[in-house]
Amino acid sequence: IKTDSGGQGSGAYEKDELQWTQYPNECHIAIFGDQTLNSHKVITTDKISYAAGRNRSQYYQMNWLADDGYVYVFSPSYAKTMSDSRQQTTLPAGVVRIDTKAEEFDAAYYYNLEEKANGASFLRTWYISGNYFLLLMYDRPFSETGYTANQLAVFKAGSEKLTYVSGLPSTDIISGFGNTLHVENGKAYIAATTTDGNPAI
């Protein structure tokens, strides 16, 4: 609990406040009525933790409108890394979806991504097309030290399959992936950087 107000930007906090997330075992989504942002409703699910990828001061998009009309909401369960037990989530990394017509979470839809990734989570997500999403995966669970996001996997909504991408350089030499995904003719392109050569797609 903070004894004084302080911080800046997303790190700002008020006196007597528990900084950062107050509800680690819930995900809250605001749905705005139009582009003026004057009216909105908030919907909540307790199936996943908050839907935001984190890397230091960077926040990454986790909500994507797919061709089937649903908004898929991914949570990497980053709150597992919090030092204060009151801010740690007990929920695994997973995905839920929002019915855009009802403007509510689809109560029947939930997929445990962490279970299919041997306990690992993900740093980023991108929408490809159809029911396909690309995930930048960590190499080990948050409970272990030295976890690094150096693998890619494709999640297919509908069949709920998580498939790791093969044919990439060894994870020992991958130093990063591009920020932007390019999709053309059903194929997704992303830059990969290695420690022993120039970036490649």
Language-model region placement:
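C-terminal structured domain segments
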Residues: L162-I201
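Surface-exposed loop and turn segments in beta-propeller and other repeat-based domains
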Residues: T36-Y59, K101-F122, G158, T163-S175
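Membrane-embedded hairpin module used as a gating/binding unit in multi-pass transport
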Residues: N25-H28, D46-T100
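Short loop/turn segments that connect beta-strands within the blades of beta-propeller domains
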Residues: N25, D67, L91, S129, ...
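Structural signature of eukaryotic scaffold interfaces centered on beta-propeller domains
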Residues: I1-D4, R56-V71, S77-K80, G119-Y132, ...
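Beta-propeller blade signature
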Residues: G9-N38, R86-E103, T148-E160, A200-I201
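Long, acidic/polar, low-complexity amphipathic helices and coiled-coil-like
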Residues: I1-A66
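Long, well-ordered mid-to-C-terminal structural blocks that present hydrophobic/aromatic surfaces
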Residues: V73-G146
